Amino acid sequence: MVEKRDSYTKEDLEASGRGELFGAGGPPLPAGNMLMMDRVVKMTEDGGTHNKGYVEAELDINPDLWFFGCHFIGDPVMPGCLGLDAMWQLVGFYLGWLGGEGKGRALGVGEVKFTGQVLPTAKKVTYRINFKRVIIRKLIMGVADGEVLVDGQVIYTASDLKVGLFKDTAAF
């Protein structure tokens, strides 16, 4: 049984990447540079705009983050796809938090809008995930809407983020 806490530290998230947080069958988060959050500050099973669950996480920004040195030289900006990936990561993390087992795979997104950017001068990125639907049966899948904020301003929105958990990804 997964111990459900309402927040997780960077060390907890790194343990998830090693397969230690949710046990051998639970979905791991990416490790190293691809882990796009420093902490989960809130998780609820019945909160959010649809009362189906809510996750809020944060990433501390500093000019030394790996992507600023290569995207783009002379014009550093966090790639928008990394913010999108962070939202998918959090959907999968939530499914593991609920006790779902398998390897997480992004299955799609309805619509993504970018209305701002993350520059090296920013201090903090916040991710907010509002679940619309969660299926925990033979099929394990989450559908959610998400927002990315930089220093309190919404800069990306995504509707219908979909993540599934798969015990066998060979035929995926």
UniProtKB/Swiss-Prot annotation:
GO biological process, one term: unsaturated fatty acid biosynthetic process
Annotated catalytic residues: 71
EC number, UniProt record: 4.2.1.59, 5.3.3.14
Localization, UniProt: Cytoplasm
Keywords: Cytoplasm, Fatty acid biosynthesis, Fatty acid metabolism, Isomerase, Lipid biosynthesis, Lipid metabolism, Lyase
Catalytic activity: a (3R)-hydroxyacyl-[ACP] = a (2E)-enoyl-[ACP] + H2O; (3R)-hydroxydecanoyl-[ACP] = (2E)-decenoyl-[ACP] + H2O; (2E)-decenoyl-[ACP] = (3Z)-decenoyl-[ACP]
UniProt cross-references to InterPro entries, sorted A to Z: FabA (IPR010083), FabA_FabZ (IPR013114), HotDog_dom_sf (IPR029069)
Keyword match Cell membrane: no
Pathway it works in: Lipid metabolism; fatty acid biosynthesis
Gene Ontology CC terms: cytoplasm
CDD domains listed in its UniProt record: FabA
Function: Necessary for the introduction of cis unsaturation into fatty acids. Catalyzes the dehydration of (3R)-3-hydroxydecanoyl-ACP to E-(2)-decenoyl-ACP and then its isomerization to Z-(3)-decenoyl-ACP. Can catalyze the dehydratase reaction for beta-hydroxyacyl-ACPs with saturated chain lengths up to 16:0, being most active on intermediate chain length.
Subunit record text: Homodimer.
Protein name: 3-hydroxydecanoyl-[acyl-carrier-protein] dehydratase
Gene symbol of the encoding locus: fabA
